[in-house]
Each structure stands twice: as structure tokens, then as C-alpha cells.
């Protein structure tokens, strides 16, 4: 279980660059950061992807919520864990509805 590295283990510091770059007196008006490339609109309009993922999230959230409600139907008083599980289930189900409805894509124009 040895190493196959057979070189010198001594490292030398690289030489500092000799070219000096002076800061211009008037900086450019545009930002130096390039604009982000436009996203593929096909990903936002993929109806089958949204239906599959949204309905899966909605189903998973419904399952988590109903599993948390099962002891309540038997008359067991809810504890903090049960309430938290119900809140998480509702949150996951709401996330699925948001994926299905896609309110951001419809309310804001895609550039």
C-alpha cells in the first residue's frame, strides 16, 4: 500500500510576477462580472417534469401528515413531535402544489 510518487518532495515558492498592472484612474462603467447565461426555457416548460415532481411531493407530504394523524384517531394526545411531523407533512405537500402551479413562472416574465 505504498505510493507511486517518485519525485522530489521539496517545493519552491513561485517567483512573483514582474508585470505590474496599474489601476486606471477612471474605472470602466460596466461591471467586470459577465452577465449570467440565459437558462434553457425547456426546463421551465417541462410539464411532465413538473407533474411528476409536484405530485410526488404532494403525495409524500400527504403520507407524512396522515401517518402523524394516525395516533390522534386512536385518542392519543398529540405531543410536540406529532405536531412537528404534521407541520412538515403540510409543508412538503404545499411545496408540491407550488411546483405544480408554478406561480413564479406565470407572474414574472422570463427574460
UniProtKB/Swiss-Prot annotation:
It is a multi-pass membrane protein. This is Distal membrane-arm assembly complex protein 1. Disulfide bonds: none annotated. It is found in: Mitochondrion inner membrane. The chain crosses the membrane at residues 51-68, 81-101. Residues 1-11 have a biased composition (Polar residues). The keyword Membrane applies. GO terms for biological process: mitochondrial respiratory chain complex I assembly. Residues 1-40 are annotated as: Disordered. Pfam families: DUF4536 (PF15055). Keywords: Membrane, Mitochondrion, Mitochondrion inner membrane, Transmembrane, Transmembrane helix. Required for the assembly of the mitochondrial NADH:ubiquinone oxidoreductase complex (complex I). Involved in the assembly of the distal region of complex I. Interacts with incompletely assembled mitochondrial NADH:ubiquinone oxidoreductase complex (complex I). InterPro entries: DMAC1-like_dom, DMAC_Protein. Residues 18-38 have a biased composition (Low complexity). It comes from Mus musculus (Mouse). PANTHER family: DISTAL MEMBRANE-ARM ASSEMBLY COMPLEX PROTEIN 1 (PTHR36469:SF1). The keyword Ligase does not apply. GO terms for cellular component: mitochondrial inner membrane.
